[in-house]
Design a protein with these regions (language model features):
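Active-site-proximal cap/lid insertion segments
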Residues: 44, 70-197
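Short, structured active-site-proximal loop/turn typified by the sulfatase FGly-forming signature C/S-X-P-X-R
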Residues: 7-8, 26, 30-36, 180, ...
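The substrate-binding groove and active-site-proximal loops of carbohydrate-active enzymes
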Residues: 12-19, 53-61, 111-127
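Acidic, His- and aromatic-enriched active-site or binding-groove loops in soluble protein domains
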Residues: 37, 53-73
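Single conserved hydrophobic/aromatic residue that forms the stacking wall/gate
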Residues: 1-6, 10-11
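Long, well-ordered early-domain segments
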Residues: 15-44
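Substrate-binding cleft/loops of secretory-pathway carbohydrate-active enzymes
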Residues: 48-54, 160-163
Length: 199
């Protein structure tokens, strides 16, 4: 969902399709000769604005299509933008012994929610990290590392969708850009996702 920052005098949720004449990152990259690929979930519209060169849907309505991604990265021979949209860490939450109450440092108020959901929520985050790690291994394996920028971001933080509190505003944002950003660099710069395209 695209929010046109500054075009409204009040803050509201814009849960509508993007206007057809809006230039999206996908349309701009395609005009510049890139293939634009979506792998995973999709609930953006209309297709005229988000016009994918290829779309690889989720596997079993849940998992990233790693085999399709691997095949694409092995054979692609032109500039590309691969957008990976994971379902994680959304539920369902698996039962797991890998995480317990001691691992949860921001406890919700409902202790039953902590015991029944948060360990599975944390496990989903770990599973998401594992899947994305496999994609990075593919990027490296097929020789794309030095010519690729990898951006990882989320639409909100810890269970904070539609919130202007910390959990809605503080989100993960990780960039791997060989030759431009030194590994293990951290920044306190304030940014939003709308800063990515002009940057």
């Amino acid at each position: 969902v695209l929010r046109l920052v500054g075009s409204e005098m009040c803050i509201r949720d814009s849960h509508i399709g993007v206007k057809p004449n809006i230039k999206s990152i996908t349309s701009l990259l395609k005009e510049s000769g890139y293939e634009v690929v979506l792998a995973g979930k999709s609930h953006v519209k209309p297709n005229k604005v988000f016009d994918w060169t290829h779309y690889f849907p989720k596997v079993n309505n849940r998992y990233l299509p790693l085999e399709k991604i691997d095949d694409y990265l092995k054979n692609v021979n032109k500039p590309f933008c691969l957008i990976i949209a994971s379902d994680y860490p959304h539920g369902p939450f698996p039962k797991t012994d890998n995480y317990g109450k001691a691992d949860i440092f921001k406890l919700p108020y409902d202790p039953n929610y902590v015991g029944n959901h948060k360990p599975g929520y944390y496990q989903n985050i770990q599973d998401d990290n594992d899947q994305l790690g496999k994609v990075l291994e593919m990027v490296d394996k097929y020789g794309h590392k030095e010519s690729s920028m990898f951006i990882y971001a989320s639409d909100h933080g810890l269970s904070g969708k539609w919130s202007l509190q910390e959990q809605g505003l503080r989100l993960p944002f990780v960039v791997r850009w060989p030759g431009k950003i030194m590994p293990n660099t951290t920044s306190e710069t304030l940014l939003t996702l709308v800063d990515v395209l002009p940057t």
